[in-house]
């Protein structure tokens, strides 16, 4: 039935809009129909003269959110915020990571979300330095940092919140130092956001702030900030981008070279992750912070 319908409709149009790389089966079907059309041209059969990737067009539409969409995303963010607060209150040494995840999911469902927008990251201690660690059976310890990256989906729109905090309720001095560096970088990145700037400008600001912080703390020695940035020495500790588009998907579609416009929604979530290394003082080991 689909083949017959496509054949009938394609004979009526000069332009074909198709989502490239979305379905191998659909592409094969369309290609076979067009091939048959070309072989029948002598008999007067018409066929599309141009083929466009409709994915790029749809992506550009999805980049700009209207008031209704933003309202939905705000509600999703509210649910996720409450879930993070619930998890923080529940958190204490002796709990398992999966127990914290269960608290998040309970709050999502309680307020109308059908499911998480992405697999929840609940990472304690050394796991906080693993970017996409899924909640496991590790037991939280007194001196751990707990990193939670979790968000719900509501009415087709995703939310994405990351928070990092001490399981004991009190930062050690090294933990606080790293936390303050990351928090400052996030605030500075947010400050410059406005229509017209390049998407990656906030990332550049976050990189500079974190690089300076790493120098000040002593995690990077004998290097100027320009040397750190030029040689990407910060990537030992901050190896991902600061943000991504957010919308119907948590990593939503859209061209990152597009200047920012009113209605675009994206995350700002810098981080710093210090894995054990002989070059680094042990007091900083296994501190993973993302905000």
Which positions does each model-derived feature cover?
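Active-site neighborhoods and metal-handling regions in enzymes and metal-associated proteins
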Residues: 1-291
